[in-house]
Swiss-Prot record:
Annotated EC: 2.4.2.10
Role noted for this protein: Catalyzes the transfer of a ribosyl phosphate group from 5-phosphoribose 1-diphosphate to orotate, leading to the formation of orotidine monophosphate (OMP).
Gene Ontology molecular function, alphabetical: magnesium ion binding; orotate phosphoribosyltransferase activity
Cofactor needs: Mg(2+)
Name used for this protein in its record: Orotate phosphoribosyltransferase
Reactions this protein catalyses: orotidine 5'-phosphate + diphosphate = orotate + 5-phospho-alpha-D-ribose 1-diphosphate
Gene designation per UniProt: pyrE
Length: 219
């Protein structure tokens, strides 16, 4: 496992953003783990998270020249990532959307740098159903930008349903024709748990969950 994956998972565990136990997801599935990016709730935690994103993005070799954060969780993530890149000597423009359009002031649903003519990297926490990402793709294209990739913190690598054996991330990538990369995925989480004495007891539930709901790429 590459260093940014290990650092991210340990950071998430320390921040209580990554928890193990029994959790009922929105899908109704009973999961042995739960990830909540909202627990990266301080400047130091968010800055460290952004460095993990930057390392994962650079390792993937994505080509982009603007960062876009979908409302709501994508906004602080993209902002922190822009700061991380600035610290590495690359000053990237940044934009995000509102959930509700304003009819006063600058108006509209977009805030930040113009998207026209830009290669846009979308930054979010996870892709669950893919609704927010699909909305972001439409917004970017309508504003004259070109989506070039999507970066998320954690890919659960779960099938959408027994009828559709793809994950939400795989479905979005296929529809949009762009790469979706994650700082870490379920396979990384399994390796991380196996190497952590405090988490060894969760190996069996994690493996069982992957066997039931995992895509063909989780091995």
């Amino acid at each position: 496992m590459t260093d940014h994956r290990t650092r991210f998972l340990q950071l998430a565990l320390d921040a209580d953003a990554l928890r193990f136990g029994e959790f009922t997801l929105k899908s109704g599935r009973l999961s042995p783990y739960f990830f909540n990016a909202g627990r990266f709730d301080s400047g130091a935690k968010t800055a460290q998270l952004a460095q993990c994103y930057a390392d994962a993005i650079e390792a993937a070799g994505l080509d982009f020249d603007l960062l876009f954060g979908p409302a709501y969780k994508g906004i602080p993530l993209a902002t922190a990532l822009a700061c991380a890149y600035a610290g590495r000597g690359r000053d990237l423009p940044l934009a995000f959307n509102r959930k509700e359009a304003k009819d006063h002031g600058e108006g509209g649903t977009l805030i930040g740098a113009p998207l026209a003519g830009r290669q846009v990297l979308i930054v979010d926490d996870v892709i669950t159903a893919g609704t927010a990402i699909r909305e972001a793709l439409a917004i970017i294209r309508a504003a004259g930008g070109t989506p070039s990739g999507i970066a998320v913190a954690l890919d659960r690598q779960e099938i959408a349903s027994d009828q559709d054996r793809r994950s939400a991330a795989q479905a979005v990538a296929a529809e949009a024709g762009i790469p979706v990369i994650a700082v870490a995925n379920l396979g990384d989480l399994l390796a991380f748990a196996a190497g952590n004495a405090d988490l060894v007891g969760f190996q069996e539930p994690l493996l069982a969950y992957r066997g039931r709901y995992g895509t063909d790429t989780t091995g």
